[in-house]
Amino acid sequence: DFCLSRGLGDVYKRQILIIAFLMFNFTGYSQTTSGQEDRAYWVNMLSQIADPLLNNMSKGELKKNMPIETISGMPNPSNARTTHLEALGRLFVGMAPWLELGPDNTQEGQIREKYIRLMTESINHGFNPQSPDYLNFTVTRQPLVDTAFFCQGLLRSPKQIWSKLSSETQKNILNALQQVSKIKPVESNWLLFSAMVEATLLELTGKCNIHPIEYAVMRFKEWYKGDAWYGDGANLHIDYYNSFVIHPMLLDVLEIMQKHSKGEVDFYRKERQRFSRYAEQQERMISPDGAYPVTGRSIAYRFGTFHVLSLAALNDLLPTTITKAQVRCGLTAVIKRHLAIKGNFDEHGWLTLGFAGHQPSIAERYISTGSLYLCSTVFTALGLPATDEFWSAPYAEWTGKKIWSGNPDVKLDKAIKL
């Protein structure tokens, strides 16, 4: 009875209202934005991530100025030799589709023109043996990984980047791919790095060593576990490597094979369906407030975990159960949830080790500053023009937000059997 007395009851009411208000705003239920606003936010965040890297490397000063943060607090020789190629290759793969739209008279088009210039200048330095920023393609096995990511970037920007590079830089890139192709991959997702390099050589020159491609395809047929999940090797790992590497690179390789009349049509068609199903699962992982399960290794790649979902939107591979608008809104919620937390960037704008802010202890020994730029792959859908439905459609709730708010308009989830 005392607790329900008038005075204390008012206090409780005020406290409840304050808590409800904070929860309501924190979860973003009232924060609906237009596609135009979301696109501007994405461009701004991608620019913020890219600026320190490209502004330095375009002048040949990346190695001079980029920090090398590791879990130990000290860069080991392996990190120091490979982190710069990691940074360029990983930023490029996520940024390339947007750059490929090319410059135009809009404000965004002028921003793109600037980054096309910075990216080409950075690539010139990275592949020029006389540049202080010449990258390592031979020492340790890590260059295989990040050259493969770089290759994806090239394939995603053939007009605005590859064709605008000088013939000398193009020759230097092809020489680097030949060097990297000698690195032997381990029996895991690494097989796709070798396949990606060879597929890129096939696309750019018409020639390649077909064996690494055929071997990787054979292995991933064997390692398929069902419902769009591949093993990372013989075993299934509950992590995000199906999104970081496996689905994007496998589909890229298979598409190039089909383009050059090589490989099986049947497996290519199956992979397209599996890719769509995995994208569907990723969309359902996003909670009402933009959080998602933190599981498995390499979580320091932050929202790069959603590479497949963003790429599915770009390549028109979303399943019929979800709309482009709800993918845009869900991914925007994820990006905002991460970046609302302080500490993701250091005082000079470089990404820091962490998942939500600065958390060095969550980084594996193979992760350093350059590794973190794989987060850029969430921005892949920026390769869709502003007029596309992805950006022009009004705000839409994603599945997690719909179902937790009691919205009856939710589709059943169903596994695929192929």
What are these regions (language model features)?
Residues 1-15:
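Single conserved hydrophobic/aromatic residue that forms the stacking wall/gate
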Residues 16-25:
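Bacterial N-terminal signal peptides
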Residues 27-29:
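Sec/Tat signal peptide C-region and signal peptidase I cleavage site
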Residues 31-87, 93, 97, 117-124:
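Low-complexity, Ser/Thr/Pro/Gly-enriched N-terminal "stalk/linker" regions
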Residues 55-79, 127, 132, 334-418:
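CBM-like carbohydrate-recognition segments
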Residues 84, 95-98, 112-272, 284-307:
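Aromatic-lined, polymer-binding surfaces characteristic
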Residues 94, 236-353, 360-387:
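Long, repeat-rich segments with strong aromatic
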Residues 107-108:
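Long, charge-dense tracts
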